Structure formats: C-alpha cells, structure tokens
C-alpha cells in the first residue's frame, strides 16, 4: 500500500487497531489518516507502547521518595541517588515474544536494548541480571530455547563487556511455548550528569546515530501485543538482529558525548523505532519535530517510508543537539566510526511532521501518540477465577508424611527449580569490567563495588510465579519482600524497584484479575519497604495456543530491586564460616507446605494457596537481621525460600564444604519444617562467643527466633540421623540440571 494511500476501518483492524480507535484517530486529525499515519498510530497505540490496558493501574503504584532523581516513566530508566554525588540508573524489560520464535537474537537484543536504556542517560552500565522462565526441561523445545536464550545473553553480554552478576531461572509447563526473558541492567552516573529523554530547543538539530536501518523488527511492537499462536513463526521478521560490537562503540561514543554538554536530549530506539523516539521525545519536551526520512541511513534497498519509521533495527539512538555544537557531536561519532546523520529539526508546534524527498507524508500531534497523553486508556473486566477459592481449601492433613525424609531431600536438592544453575550462569562472564564481589563469596543479593568508593550496589531479581498464581496480591507482596530480604541479608538497605509484569491476555477477565491483584500487592509492599517504583514494562499476551486451547502463563510480576551498601566491610555472605558456629532461625516456622516445590514435585499437588505471609512480620524480621549485621554479630545470613529450610542450610554448607547438625521442631510436621516455604524466615550463623549478645538483641516480643543447630566439619545430621556428607549433596546439586538439559 502506498504511504499516502487513504485508509479504512478495515485497514486499521488489519494493523491491530480497534474500530473505535480508528474513529478516535480520525477525530484527532480531523480527517482520514493516510497509510503512513495509520501505521504510526498502530504501533504507538499497541499495548507494547501505549500500556493502554495497564496504565490506569500502574499510576496507583508508589513512585515518590527522597532518593528519586527521575519520575517513573519520564526518562529511559529509573534514577536513584546513592550518595557521594553518584546516582544509579537501572531498569528491567522483557523480550519474551521474540525469544519464543528466535531465542538467540530475541535474548541478545533484549540485553542490548536494556543496556542502551542505561547509557542513553549518560550512565555507564556496570552489571546485568536476568530472569528466565522455560517449560519442561526434559522437552526438546525447552532445551532448544534454553540453549538459544543463554547463548544470546552470553554472546551479547560478554562481547559488550558488561558482567552478568546474578539472576533466576525457573521451569514450569505453563511456559512451554512462551518463555519469559527479562533483562536488567544498572549503571552509574554523576548526579546532574544524566541526559534527558526530552527534546528541547526550537531549531536544534535531530540526529540518528548508530547502525543503519533495515527491515528487521518492523511491526515488532505490534507483534509483542498479540497472542503467540501456531502461526507465530510467520512473524520471525519481527525479531530484531543485534551487534554487540557496534553497541560497544556506541557506548563509548555516548560516554564521550556526555562530557561535552552538547546534547539536549537522547533516546534509545527500541519498540517502534524512529516513530516512538521522535514522538516520546517531542511530547516529553512539549515541542514538535520535522523529520526527513530519506536522510536516514539504510542497509536495504527500496525501503518504504513507513518501514523506516517502524523499523526496530538495533544499536540506534535519536539525539537532539544544541544549535552550534553539531560539528563537536559529529567529530565524536566519526572518531568511533559510527553513523551520525542529521535527519530533522525541533519545531515550536506540537506537530510531528515526516517528509520523504521533501514531500510531507504524515502530520500528527505528538501528544496524541504517547501513553499518558492521547493514547487510549482502558479498564478491562475483572473476574475472580474459580480456582482461587478452591486453592484455599487445601488441607495439609490430607498430605501423607513421608517415611523416608532423606530420600525426599535427595529429590528436592536435584529439582530443576532448586538445583544449581551453573550450567547456565557459567556461560556468562561475571567479572568483566567491574568488581563483582558475588562470584567467589555469594550473598543473597549480587554486590557490585563502586570504583573509588567504600560503597557498593546490591541488586537482585525475584518472583515466584506459582505463589502469584495461587494469590496474586500475596504472591507479589512476597516477590517484593524477598528482594528486600535478599538485600538486607547481604548488608544493604533497599532503595527502589523496577518491574517486568508478565501476564496473559488482558481481555481475559481472569488474567486481568491477576494483574490488578499483583499491582495491589506490589503497591502495599513497596510502601512498607519505602522502595518506590522507578518504571519497568508490561508484557501481556504471554500464552500459547495449541489447537483450540489457550493457556496463559502463570502471572509473573518480576521485581528487580537495588539497594545501597554504605560500607563494603558490612557485606554479609551466605556460606558457613567455621565449624562449631551456631545456626539460628530468625522468624517463625509454620506447619505450611502450600505452593512449595516439595508439595508440587513430591506429592504432585498443584492446587494450594500461597505460603503463609504477613507483611508486618516480614518487615520486623528484616529490621532485626539488619541490626545484627550492622553490629557485626553474625557470620552469615541466608533467607529461606524455594525448597525450604533444608535447601537454605545446604546452600550455605555446599559453598564452604561444611555441614550442619540440626534438630527439627517436634510440634511441627518434619516435612513442613524442612521443606515448607512459609515466608519471613532468615537463617544466620553466629560464633559461640557472640551468642549471648545475639540473644540479648533478640529478646523482644516482635520477632521469634530459635536455635536450629550448629555447623559441622562436613557431616549432615538431622534429628541425630546421619544423612551423609555435604560433598554427596553438592554433587547432586551441581550436576542435576546439566544432566537433564544435555540428554
């Protein structure tokens, strides 16, 4: 169809717009849009760009805090003051649909895109995390996806030179056709040295810098805004192709550019490419732009103007340059051998005007395109699923207690969701370019030193989607709380979060119920921990159609949190230090096995509520442990999560080749005591010399604590029964996942 061709409501529907949205576009323009204009609206009003089905609820999240230097959603990433004149810039985003079709490029470009969001703000990336979800690890498809995704992340990240310092990997059949690939990056910038994503200065030049533009990723935003089906393989051209070496050059050029104060605004070209960056920068600065599409460097012949507008070719950015500084900017990009081409100018009016060989092919008010502006806002139907009340009827008394707990323990430690992920993370470079403290001496959170400072950044990513499925509000509170717990256990102070909200189809009332419940839970927990939401993204339509059946994934609101370690001498690790140290649990134990790996994998029970959780209790437990760390009383700290107490004890033991001797609580079922996943529990170790001081500090009514046992030279003993040696369990733990994926 010709760029200037007239359109109809049928054309709009083919591009993914609703009939009423087409009517609104005609109303905004005061005329019928041409084909180019309709394409622009189709991507900017897609779910991926407009958040039209989520923005109403996202606005309810807490976004303010004294440490916040940028309002959520107004810049390329979140920005938080970390003291000493420095700020941490961080964000998490999804690349789920592209990774489902082309796992290597889908994951690689996800890594590239999230890092561009960081350095486009003038911050140098220092570390990456990722959160990955796959189907049954025994299936051929899952093995193909794992191999491609991990290679994509490692190839791009290792080549780009930014370490991957942590993350999480889960397997569940609900992700069989629709994996989740969520990528996080964090960087450091001087306070006041950040670059805005807003255009300003009438008459200032608009440049495109980076790679040339091709057809890869055209309509990628629209592709990410619909269900994955058996026909989705036809959408592979919507998957972008990345070049980490070009991105490295772009990073260094941008760092140099940030020093000369010649840039008035800069934005990464991600979803919807030039269309999105020009519209968001213009709307953000309340200005317009004239853009000459024939000036854009292309790498494929015969590209139509609308293809150039919608291309999602990677490693590109839009830069607004201060008038008179054009040569300074050009010299920097020439030095790094990177395309730097003037393609437009900032104008006074609110209009975005696009030209092709001096002919105007589109004219649109910028504000009408963007979320929070003229883009649609919907509130979808909500319906509580039947399973929700059914899950709450779960009765632990109907679950038989196993006669051989050791046999169960061996199975638990080798489960794909429990066992070591070294098969995956050993493919990542965890040390390049930074001082990562977590490689040799792990903490619950990843700890990255700040050059020239005694401070460090703690960062973590967490979400147990089975908990969220069982109870969206409680499950999401747990996700936020576990992030905070991990940072506290590492010696840090939680600061702020970013989120990646992965859900099914928002037009499904039960899915929308899950989504709204998750927002409520996130809001409550973030307010309690004083961790404002800096931004993130929403990824709907994560589900799979096989024949006539559509199954949404478990709701997966992935939370990434950063915290500040004010003194690296206070960093606390998880491994046992010395034989004879005493093992204490801070927080109460309940007779609870709900939604645990034990219940699902040993008893085959999928229907149960979220684990027992109380937000105030959680907060009190964390404050207690934080105080113990500050007073340098304890030797290690490790939170209890998947797999329960036994797995937590083993993880600390295996890192040090030490063992443990413990006694279970006779008032609680042994399986619940060892493998239950009730929340708000932290295992600490303390030397006998410090035990009295520990007890004195813990003798308050607000937080329960009890002696669990002591550290041994290597033997594992439970209730005076010999369970073998730590090396046996470590062999199971280290090799189980690799043996499955290599079959």
Regions found by a protein language model. Name each.
Residues 2-15, 19-21, 27-38, 177-179, ...:
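Glycine-/charge-enriched secondary-structure boundary and capping motifs
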Residues 2-5, 75-338, 342-356, 370-379, ...:
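Mobile "lid/hinge" segments at catalytic clefts and subdomain interfaces of large enzymes
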Residues 4-81, 86:
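N-terminal amphipathic, basic-rich helices that act as targeting or association modules
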Residues 16, 244, 616-619:
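Alpha-helix N-cap/helix-start motif at coil-to-helix transitions, marked by capping-box chemistry
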Residues 20, 249-252, 620:
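Generic alpha-helical secondary structure signal
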Residues 30, 261, 419-422:
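Generic alpha-helical structural signal
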Residues 42-46, 59, 271, 334, ...:
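Short amphipathic alpha-helical surface patches that mediate protein-protein
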Residues 49, 60-109, 113-115, 119, ...:
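Non-catalytic terminal/interface segments that mediate subunit docking, oligomerization
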């Amino acid at each position: 169809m010709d760029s200037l061709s007239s359109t109809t409501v049928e054309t709009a529907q083919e591009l993914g717009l609703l009939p009423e949205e087409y009517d609104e576009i005609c109303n905004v323009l005061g005329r019928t849009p041409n084909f180019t204009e309709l394409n622009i609206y189709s991507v900017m009003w897609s779910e991926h760009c407009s958040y039209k089905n989520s923005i109403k609820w996202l606005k309810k999240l807490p976004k303010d805090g004294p440490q916040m230097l940028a309002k959520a959603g107004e810049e390329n990433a979140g920005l938080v003051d970390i003291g000493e004149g420095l700020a941490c810039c961080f964000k998490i985003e999804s690349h789920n649909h592209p990774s489902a079709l082309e796992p290597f490029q889908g994951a690689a470009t996800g890594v590239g895109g999230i890092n561009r969001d960081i350095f486009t703000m003038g911050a140098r990336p220092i570390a990456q995390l990722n959160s990955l979800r796959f189907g049954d690890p025994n299936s051929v498809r899952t093995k193909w996806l794992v191999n491609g995704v991990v290679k994509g992340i490692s190839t791009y990240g290792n080549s780009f030179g930014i370490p991957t310092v942590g993350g999480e990997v889960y397997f569940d059949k609900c992700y069989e056709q629709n994996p989740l690939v969520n990528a996080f990056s964090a960087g450091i910038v001087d306070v006041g040295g950040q670059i805005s994503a807003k255009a300003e200065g009438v008459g200032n030049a608009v440049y495109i810098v980076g790679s040339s533009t091709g057809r890869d990723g055209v309509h990628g935003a629209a592709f990410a805004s619909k269900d994955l089906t058996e026909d989705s393989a036809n959408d592979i051209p919507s998957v972008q192709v990345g070049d980490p070496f070009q991105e490295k050059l772009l990073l260094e050029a941008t760092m140099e550019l940030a020093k000369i104060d010649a840039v008035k605004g800069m934005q990464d070209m991600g979803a919807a490419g030039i269309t999105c960056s020009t519209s968001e920068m213009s709307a953000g600065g309340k200005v317009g732009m004239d853009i000459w599409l024939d000036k854009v460097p292309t790498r494929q012949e015969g590209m139509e103007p609308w293809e150039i507008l919608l291309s999602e070719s990677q490693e590109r950015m839009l830069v607004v340059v201060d008038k008179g500084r054009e040569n300074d900017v050009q010299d920097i990009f020439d030095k790094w051998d990177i395309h730097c081409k003037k393609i437009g100018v900032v104008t006074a009016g609110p209009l975005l005007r696009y030209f092709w060989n001096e002919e105007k092919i589109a004219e649109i008010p910028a504000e009408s395109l963007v979320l929070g502006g003229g883009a649609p806002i919907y509130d979808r139907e909500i319906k509580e699923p039947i399973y929700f009340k059914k899950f709450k009827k779960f009765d632990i008394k109907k679950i038989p207690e196993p006669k051989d707990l050791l046999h169960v323990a061996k199975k638990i430690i080798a489960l794909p969701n429990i066992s070591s992920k070294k098969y995956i993370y050993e493919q990542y470079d965890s040390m390049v370019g930074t001082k990562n403290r977590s490689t040799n001496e792990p903490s619950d959170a990843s700890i990255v030193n700040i050059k020239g400072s005694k401070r460090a950044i703690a960062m973590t990513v967490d979400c147990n989607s089975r908990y969220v499925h069982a109870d969206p509000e409680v499950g999401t509170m747990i996700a936020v709380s576990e992030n905070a717990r991990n940072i506290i256990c590492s010696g840090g102070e939680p600061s702020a979060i970013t989120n990646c909200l992965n859900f099914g189809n928002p037009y499904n009332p039960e899915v929308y119920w899950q989504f709204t419940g998750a927002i409520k839970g996130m809001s409550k927990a973030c307010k309690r921990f004083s961790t404002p939401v800096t931004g993130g993204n929403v990824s709907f339509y994560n589900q799979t159609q096989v024949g006539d059946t559509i199954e949404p994934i478990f709701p997966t609101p992935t939370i990434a949190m950063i915290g500040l370690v004010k003194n690296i001498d206070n960093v606390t690790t998880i491994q046992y230090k010395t034989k004879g140290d005493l093992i204490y649990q801070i927080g109460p134990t309940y007779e609870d096995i709900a939604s645990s790996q034990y219940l699902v994998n040993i008893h085959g029970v999928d229907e149960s509520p979220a684990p027992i959780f109380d937000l105030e209790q959680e907060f009190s437990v964390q404050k207690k442990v934080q105080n113990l760390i500050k007073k340098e009383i304890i030797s290690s700290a490790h939170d209890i999560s998947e797999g329960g107490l036994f797995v937590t004890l083993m993880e600390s033991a295996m890192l040090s080749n030490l063992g443990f001797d413990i006694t279970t609580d006779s008032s609680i079922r042994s399986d619940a005591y060892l493998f239950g996943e009730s929340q708000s529990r932290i295992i600490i170790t303390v030397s006998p010399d410090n035990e009295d001081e520990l007890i004195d500090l813990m003798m308050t009514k607000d937080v329960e604590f009890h002696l669990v046992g002591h550290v041994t030279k290597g033997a594992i003993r439970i209730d005076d029964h010999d369970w073998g040696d730590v090396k046996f369990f470590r062999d199971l733990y280290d090799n189980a996942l690799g043996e499955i994926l290599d079959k």
